[in-house]
């Protein structure tokens, strides 16, 4: 990927860093260039701290063996917390969605992170998500409600429909956050009040 058509004017290490930044989601060529030139002006220790933080995340952070949220231990803090309601599992697409829901203070159950959504056009199918692991949890844990908090967009609705089909034979209550979240949006961008109200007013499927 070449970000600059006049890349021959830019030193190779600079061009490479611009291209690496531009690979990140939500960062276009202009932002990638600004970040790169900011780091060029920064003190060496600041650039070293950034590089070390990236390496530390990759080396130290993994996924909870129970819910697949991010963690530095075998189990995440939520799964280790005995005060959480063990009878409820809130299913979300990404770890960022867990953070968004936790900020509301409206939910005290457990989570299950799918790490994506059904999107055949993008080559993402059922087997690419943590769905079998969710079904295994519902079968083996004292769960009486599964909240399908996938994003309120086409992919999220399709994923929720598939999950409902898979959960139906297990005899567990399946709910979805109430209408009120912006259609087509992501949970991580919803304000805490709106998201909290949607969770408290969740509807049965």
UniProtKB/Swiss-Prot annotation:
Keywords: DNA damage, DNA recombination, DNA repair, Metal-binding, Zinc, Zinc-finger. GO terms for molecular function: DNA binding; zinc ion binding. A zinc finger (C4-type) spans 64-79. GO terms for biological process: DNA recombination; DNA repair. InterPro entries: DNA_Rcmb_RecR, Rcmb_RecR, Rcmb_RecR_Znf, TOPRIM_dom, TOPRIM_RecR. Coiled coil: none annotated. The keyword Zinc-finger applies. May play a role in DNA repair. It seems to be involved in an RecBC-independent recombinational process of DNA repair. It may act with RecF and RecO. Belongs to the RecR family. This is Recombination protein RecR. It comes from Chloroflexus aggregans (strain MD-66 / DSM 9485).
